[in-house]
Every structure is written in structure tokens, then in C-alpha cells.
């Protein structure tokens, strides 16, 4: 759980840092595989206006599955996709030059 929360916070920090030095509002389209308690830090940040304070407008959408989230990222309908690493592996194994990158993962030890 700690690793996952660190991953989510790293994403949020990365997005926040992208807006440093600008007064304009940047829109970030975020697609998640499903609404989940694992994304609680993100939901809190949205509700508390932390992203808006940093000049970010987050457009959150429920992708309805990892395949649909990956399709949204690959077609430019989403800037960031929250899904399992297997979706990225499938695209990578197709030999695509421009493939997504996994930068965080939640692992459970039971």
C-alpha cells in the first residue's frame, strides 16, 4: 500500500511540477481503470483543490478497464492512464516505437 501511495503521490508531484513558473491553467486528462480506494490521495487532492492551487485542471475519467485506459492514452484522449502494468507490456510486445512507460506499481505480498 505504501508503494502504491508513493507512486500516486509521485504522479501528482510530477504533474504539479510541470506547471511551475506559469500562471496559466494547464489541463491534464487522467483516465483511471476504475474508481478505487487505492486512488484516495488523488481524490482528496482533487476535492481539496490542491491541483487548482498549482494551476492544474484535472479532467478525471473512468476508463472502464485497462484496455480502454491504454487506448485513451495511445490515441491522445488521456495524458495519464492509471492501470496495471500488463496493458503496457502488451503494447511493448507489439514492437511499437512509441510505447507507454510504467513508472509506479502496487504489489501485494499475500
Name the predicted role of every residue range:
Residues 1-27:
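Short, low-complexity disordered leader/linker segments with a strong preference
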Residues 24-110:
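Short, glycine-/small- and polar/acidic-enriched structural segments
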Amino acid at each position: 500500500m505504501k508503494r502504491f501511495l508513493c507512486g500516486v503521490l509521485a504522479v501528482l508531484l510530477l504533474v504539479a511540477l510541470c506547471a511551475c513558473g506559469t500562471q496559466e491553467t494547464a489541463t491534464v486528462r487522467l483516465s483511471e481503470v476504475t474508481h478505487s480506494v487505492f486512488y484516495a490521495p488523488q481524490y482528496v487532492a482533487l476535492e481539496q483543490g490542491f491541483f487548482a492551487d498549482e494551476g492544474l485542471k484535472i479532467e478525471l475519467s473512468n476508463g472502464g478497464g485497462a484496455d480502454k485506459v491504454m487506448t485513451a492514452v495511445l490515441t491522445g484522449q488521456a495524458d495519464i492512464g492509471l492501470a496495471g502494468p500488463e496493458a503496457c507490456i502488451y503494447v511493448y510486445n507489439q514492437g511499437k516505437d512509441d510505447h507507454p512507460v510504467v513508472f509506479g506499481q502496487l504489489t501485494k505480498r499475500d
